[in-house]
């Protein structure tokens, strides 16, 4: 029942995400500004010249110019509220990529549409997380065997694959994000800064490519499914992702508290405007980019929290078991995690819990089976 509710919520978030992201942007004037900047050789700050030709393919270059103009103020710290939001968003990007890439590697998702995580990652960047995140997660709950009938065998990830995912996210996402954020012209020339922002648009691809080569070099581990404990490599990837997500989330609010005069002001940078007020107009491109990013983050967060709670509750546990938790208790714990780790960090934590629970249940089932076999052998010996 909770997963059915999750599917319905996620299905409803898809058109809502389309409106708050693109419909609202069209009404408030941001889309028109995008189109205007796409025709110019000056970036969205109004002063930086650039060529705008990156690949020689006009259609692709037009898309890259649009993304570049959007992320240019984000990468340059032109506004403290936008910079804070982008910093927090970037931190949540680590568990986001880890979650998706691990889903692509799970046996229960093999050959399913949700295993094509690189394609979905690019669509996240191009179409927007507010639309593509609920769509991907809806398809996951609908089709994935790790969601419909979870078991240790279906969610098990080879330890070396887990290491490769961690390596891929660090080299393909974390490093490009840090490099893109370096100031110009003090550390980066304008041309280098522009190219770094353009390069960053394909971080889901770079992360997947790096993970592929790392996985090929490491090979397959022989202990991925035979161990009675969750592989330490997988746990290490989960833990590292949560450390980054938590550190950036807490640091964001600490900085905001230092910059704000009131308690309510701490959360101002996070709260998006009413998307159904079609009379609202942006006063600048910077303001429009901030609103866009706020809604992208909000919808993504809601989608992943709904999905993760459904995934965690989807493990069948008898009510008599000490592992059993009600949906309400899981939801309350999830909200507490969200406050500390951020939404995607909380979602990853719930998936980690799910994995650990499946390993424990499998181990207990094996021990129970071994005891039953021992009893049968004892009876057979007594009456022989």
Swiss-Prot record:
Per the UniProt entry, the Enzyme Commission number(s) are 5.4.99.-
- Glycosylation sites noted in the Swiss-Prot or TrEMBL record: 109, 258, 372
Applied biotechnology uses = Ascofuranone is a specific inhibitor of trypanosome alternative oxidase (TAO), and quickly kills African trypanosomes in vitro and cures infected mice. As an essential factor for trypanosome survival, TAO is a promising drug target due to the absence of alternative oxidases in the mammalian host.
Variant or mutagenesis effect after changing residue 355 to A: Leads to significant loss of activity
Q: Provide GO CC annotations from the record.
A: membrane
- Lineage: superkingdom: Eukaryota
State what induces this protein: Expression is induced on AF medium.
**Residue ranges of the TM segments:** 82-102, 119-139, 164-184, 194-214, 235-255, 291-311, 330-350
Which pathway does the UniProt entry assign to this protein? Secondary metabolite biosynthesis; terpenoid biosynthesis
The protein's topology relative to the membrane is: Multi-pass membrane protein
Q: Does the keyword Membrane apply?
A: yes
Q: What is this protein called?
A: Terpene cyclase ascI
Species whose genome carries this gene: Acremonium egyptiacum
Gene of origin?
ascI
């Amino acid at each position: 029942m909770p997963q059915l509710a999750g599917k319905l919520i996620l299905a409803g978030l898809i058109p809502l995400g389309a409106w708050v992201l693109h419909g609202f942007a069209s009404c408030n004037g941001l889309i028109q500004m995008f189109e205007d900047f796409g025709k110019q050789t000056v970036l969205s700050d109004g002063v930086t010249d650039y060529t705008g030709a990156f690949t020689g393919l006009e259609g692709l270059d037009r898309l890259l110019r649009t993304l570049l103009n959007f992320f240019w103020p984000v990468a340059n710290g032109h506004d403290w509220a936008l910079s804070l939001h982008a910093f927090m968003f970037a931190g949540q990007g680590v568990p986001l990529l880890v979650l998706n890439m691990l889903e692509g590697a799970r046996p229960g998702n093999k050959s399913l549409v949700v295993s094509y995580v690189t394609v979905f990652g690019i669509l996240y960047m191009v179409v927007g997380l507010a639309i593509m995140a609920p769509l991907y997660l809806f398809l996951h709950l609908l089709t994935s065997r790790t969601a419909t009938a979870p078991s240790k065998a279906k969610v098990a990830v080879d330890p070396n694959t887990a290491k490769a995912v961690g390596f891929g996210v660090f080299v393909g996402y974390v490093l490009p994000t840090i490099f893109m954020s370096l100031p110009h012209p003090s550390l980066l020339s304008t041309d280098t800064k522009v190219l770094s922002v353009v390069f960053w648009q394909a971080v889901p691809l770079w992360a997947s490519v790096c993970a592929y080569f790392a996985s090929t070099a490491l090979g397959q581990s022989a202990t991925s499914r035979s161990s009675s404990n969750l592989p330490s490599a997988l746990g290490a990837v989960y833990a590292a992702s949560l450390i980054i997500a938590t550190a950036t989330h807490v640091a964001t609010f600490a900085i905001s508290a230092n910059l704000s005069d009131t308690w309510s002001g701490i959360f101002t940078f996070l709260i998006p405007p009413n998307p159904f007020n079609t009379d609202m107009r942006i006063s600048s491109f910077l303001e429009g980019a901030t609103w866009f990013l706020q809604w992208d983050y909000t919808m993504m967060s809601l989608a992943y929290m709904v999905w993760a709670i459904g995934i965690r509750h989807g493990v069948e546990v008898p009510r008599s078991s000490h592992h059993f938790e009600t949906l309400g208790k899981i939801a309350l714990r999830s909200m507490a995690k969200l406050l500390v780790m951020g939404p995607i960090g909380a979602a990853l934590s719930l998936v980690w819990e799910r994995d650990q629970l499946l390993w424990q249940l499998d181990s207990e089932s094996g021990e129970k089976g071994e005891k039953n076999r021992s009893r049968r052998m004892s009876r057979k010996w007594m009456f022989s």
